[in-house]
Amino acid sequence: VRRFHELFFTLSPDKSAIEGNISRALLLADKSAYNYYRDFSEKGYYNRIVAGNINQVVQVDSVLCDFDRYPYAVRTYARQMIIRATNVTERSLVTVCRLLNTSRSDDNPNGFNIEGFEIVENKDVTTRKR
């Protein structure tokens, strides 16, 4: 779950790097994550990252997982830093999903597939000048 968030939400102003990381992230999840990618892409989010020379870094604070019931319910708390030429914005990111057991592979070494991925919160916390 941590690796998925790092791949999906850490972006650099390089189109091929974005596509590579997103592709690797989507190998760990079902269509719910792809739907977010498609929505962000259609709204021009990734193009604005590249055009604005913006770096976005995610730091996962905690991953809460209920291993008592299957599929395993997960809630992830993270911080996003959106680094622009003139300012840095810190955002709060909270997501939920479920984990399904799956075969381990080179692309998915932990053997879990993320399903029902949903962004619950993604709001600005602070913005400071650079």
What are these regions (language model features)?
Residues 1-11:
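Juxtamembrane and targeting peptides
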